[in-house]
């Protein structure tokens, strides 16, 4: 496969917009054997949502399904970029990019604009590209600097025995 700005790193996460993270995690684990799931308390961040600055409050949890990270997002504020699809369930997959601005530009050149952008407290730039008109979902892009965190989620799953599914991150 030839390398492009978007395929250097494989898709490494799928994300679900959920009403109740713990219930979803338990159902996903029971069916697929995914887990354990490490959750974070709600946080509020100022984000750009379709050109408007909003305060987004949400909780997240992360689990593992083979080599794929599973992210669960429970949103506690409105408006928000998760409810646009009109239902709970699959929301986006994630790909790392070395050139964030170049990726945004490449998507714009073929008609796909960001639904949402933000910069984390640690300086990580994140965007959800709106691919719904063609693919029915969004794509999250950001730099691979998150790899150590993602590796820690995978490490929690490595020798997991199926018990203690729901854990507070950092506890």
What are these regions (language model features)?
Residues 10, 121-125:
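Short acidic/glycine-enriched loop/turn segments that link adjacent beta-strands
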Residues 38-44, 117-121:
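A short, aromatic/hydrophobic, helix- or strand-capping loop or linear motif
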Residues 1-12, 16-38, 52-111, 130-171:
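Glyoxalase I/VOC metalloenzyme domain signal
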Residues 114, 126-128:
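Intrinsic, low-complexity N-terminal interaction/targeting segments
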Residues 45-47, 81, 124-126:
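Short secondary-structure boundary/hinge segments and terminal tails
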Residues 41-47, 109-113:
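Short Pro/Gly-enriched beta-strand edge/turn motifs at strand-loop
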